[in-house]
Amino acid sequence: IGAAMGALISGYFIIPMIGIKNTINLAVWINLLAAGIAYIYANSQNYIHISEKLLDKSSTTQSNKSSLINTSFSFVIVMIIGFVCLGLETVYVHMLAIVAGNSVYAFSLMLFTFLIGLGLGSELSRQLMVKNINAIYFICMLSIFLSLTIILTLFTWDQIPGYFASFEHFPFIDSFAEREFIRGLVCFLVMFPPAVIIGCLYPTCLQHVSNMARGIKIQAISSAIALNTVGNILGVLIIGFVILPYFGAMNSIILLAYLSFIICIYCIMFHNFKQKIVTLFFIFLIVVAYLNLPKNFNHNRLATGSNVYFKEYNYGEVIAHHESLDGGLTTVHESHMPNDRTIRTLQTNGKFQGTDRSEGEMIPQLGFGLVPLLHTKQRNDALVIGYGTGTTTKILYEAGFENMDVVDISNDIFTLANK
């Protein structure tokens, strides 16, 4: 709850008031304050530090070694859950940046929702485990629900822009607060269900590891936590920098659903519990949902810009697109004029970047390069902030500058603009 509130308050209040650098400094001082309070409290309680010999090498019995072997599959499950958790957060944040907005406010909403879901899921898991529910059956069902939830969300992503556009003629949706509330609602509906399930899975798996590791519980749980963290790191790196850029968001999400499904299959094949008919029914639902998935997202819908303007802008059919963590979704649209002329428009996450229409936005693009030349005769160094379609950069290049630096939010813009 503290982490979730920190994400929300920082994004909407602290960062706008004091800036990013001061917010980071404030976070450091708060951490130091917490450490100081903990140190003072520990000394005030007169804790006696006793070196407890938890497990001597000579006391490691064959039974303990057998327990460690039995927990090996549990370790793999915990690692996969870590991979799915942070991998799913990475790709969901990417998708929500496309359909809900790519700003510090939007990211705060996403992170707040995800953390609240994890916290609620952990508490729900604690209450259920008190009732002595079979841990492996619980893990199996949670994995099924997670896989099903992930697949079902694939049907909703390209419908979200249309939902935002439906508010175009609503008179009361015209302020920042009202629009942020709607964005927050969308983030909640998309991210909260899988976050709750993941929040349930993690402590349940640790409980299962503890049950399996007779005599070596502390070592087993410590190893499980470490492997879960390794899975978190691999999930961010592999999904964010390999799967997403090269295979797209949809395939990334499907891969994570597969991994969750593998956990379920393992539980059914290698463990005995009475409720297998129920699990097979939900597996059937997953298969049906998967077989009805579209081949890809409808990029014409995703790139309408309704998340920015709460109104649809149709620049034609998407003929090229690139996805990445830094740029979200960059698209090139092609439309045909009545005189058989073809117009191409570049957008990033639905936001207009530029067009090749000479009587339209091409004029400002030319002006951004020509007007500064009226005020200087120097042709040494030039900095262009925002590449767009490359028109302004071309003007300055033709003006004869010796050195030019061009910066933009994403390499995808350079890639598509130069095609």
Task: List the predicted regions and their residue ranges.
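Alpha-helical transmembrane segments of multi-pass membrane proteins
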Residues: 1-419
